[in-house]
């Protein structure tokens, strides 16, 4: 859910081409499979397309391939921190609900053994926290993109004077 929500948010803010949102599990259960149909249905009810998602495992390369590693609960956060090859990589690991100021708990519940309403509730949590995460990342990202655009235009701004 979080991958789909965050990607959609980035696209709607005009930054989809500059942000890569992926999802990976800490176990190899369901590798290659689609998301649970109840997840896809919950996403669909809120206007998201979760049909392209396929489960894949988090690997050692995942740390170097990503600037941020977002865990949905403290158990996964602990596992990811243990897997980090060094302190810099460990520092990339954070909890999604840490970006929701109103969250009473830092763990996103696993709705797998629950009813449809729980899937919808979990999705609402993910949406709120994803907006908080995006608000935190957006200024630095836009600034970085602006600096790149400025560097591309700088040479023409400083052309030599004509005599």
Show which residues each predicted segment covers.
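Short polar/charged helix/loop
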Residues: 1-163
């Amino acid at each position: 859910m979080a991958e789909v929500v965050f990607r959609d948010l980035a696209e709607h803010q005009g930054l989809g081409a500059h942000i890569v949102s992926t999802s990976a599990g800490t176990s190899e259960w369901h590798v290659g499979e689609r998301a649970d149909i109840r997840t896809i249905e919950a996403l669909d009810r809120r206007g998201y397309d979760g049909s392209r998602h396929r489960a894949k495992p988090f690997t050692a390369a995942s740390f170097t391939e990503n600037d941020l590693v977002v865990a949905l609960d403290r158990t996964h956060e602990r596992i990811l921190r243990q897997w980090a090859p060094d302190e810099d990589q460990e520092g990339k690991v954070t909890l999604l609900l840490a970006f929701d100021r109103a969250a009473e708990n830092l763990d996103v519940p696993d709705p797998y053994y629950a009813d449809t309403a729980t899937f919808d509730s979990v999705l609402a949590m993910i949406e709120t926290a994803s907006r908080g995460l995006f608000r935190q990342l957006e200024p630095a990202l836009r600034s970085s993109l602006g600096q790149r655009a400025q560097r591309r235009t700088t040479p023409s701004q400083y052309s030599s004077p004509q005599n």
